[in-house]
């Protein structure tokens, strides 16, 4: 929130919301570095590992939005019990790299590559920890946006066997929403 304007976005007065948004912005940056290093195995692997770690962090950022410390602590502990063994397993048995799909999307080969059943179960659990805090805190816009993104991800996975590569759409849509809210709604309707 800029100190030089009378219009403020109340949603962004929480440091955890900034961290939550930054997780999407950083993912866009990491994907850029994967794209420019797609043919360099070392850098491809490094940036794919960073993308994987950021994906692991996103539900934590979402859980931190919860105001009730008891619920927050319970969800964080549950998520860590799930994600730590899965992360060790993924990093131990798989070569982390990305490639270009048949429709020219970025394919994170470590995400869904060996056992689809367990990968889908893992994705559903990840999704619960990512979306439940938005529902619990009644962040309706964020929850609706998350569900819309889920539908697009599902369609993209069905069509191209890729699940990521939509971060720039997500970030730009969020920023367009906040720009319209700040520049059009607040000055004329508040």
State what each model feature region is.
Residues 62-129:
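Membrane-proximal helix-loop-helix units in multi-pass membrane proteins
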Residues 8-21, 72-77, 137-146, 189-190:
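Membrane-interfacial loop-to-transmembrane alpha-helix junctions, especially the N-terminal start
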Residues 2-3, 61-62, 107-156:
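Alpha-helical transmembrane segments in multipass membrane proteins, preferentially the mid-helix core
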Residues 44-56, 112-126, 165-175:
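Alpha-helical transmembrane segments of polytopic membrane proteins
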Residues 136-190:
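C-terminal transmembrane-bundle signature of multipass membrane proteins
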């Amino acid at each position: 929130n800029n100190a030089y304007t009378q219009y403020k976005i109340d949603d962004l007065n929480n440091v955890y919301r900034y961290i939550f948004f930054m997780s999407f912005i950083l993912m866009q940056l990491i994907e850029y570095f994967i794209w420019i290093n797609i043919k360099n195995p070392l850098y491809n692997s490094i940036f794919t590992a960073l993308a994987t770690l950021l994906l692991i962090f996103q539900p934590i950022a979402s859980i931190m939005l919860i105001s009730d410390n008891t619920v927050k602590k319970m969800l964080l502990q549950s998520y860590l019990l799930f994600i730590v063994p899965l992360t060790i397993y993924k990093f131990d048995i798989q070569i982390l790299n990305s490639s270009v799909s048949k429709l020219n999307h970025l394919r994170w080969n470590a995400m869904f590559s060996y056992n689809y059943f367990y990968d889908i179960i893992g994705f559903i659990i990840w999704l619960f920890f990512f979306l439940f805090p938005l529902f619990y805190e009644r962040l309706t816009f964020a929850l609706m946006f998350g569900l819309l993104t889920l539908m697009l991800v599902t369609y993209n996975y069905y069509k191209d066997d890729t699940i990521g590569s939509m971060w720039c759409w997500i970030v730009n849509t969020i920023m367009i929403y906040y720009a319209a809210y700040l520049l059009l709604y607040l000055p004329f309707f508040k």
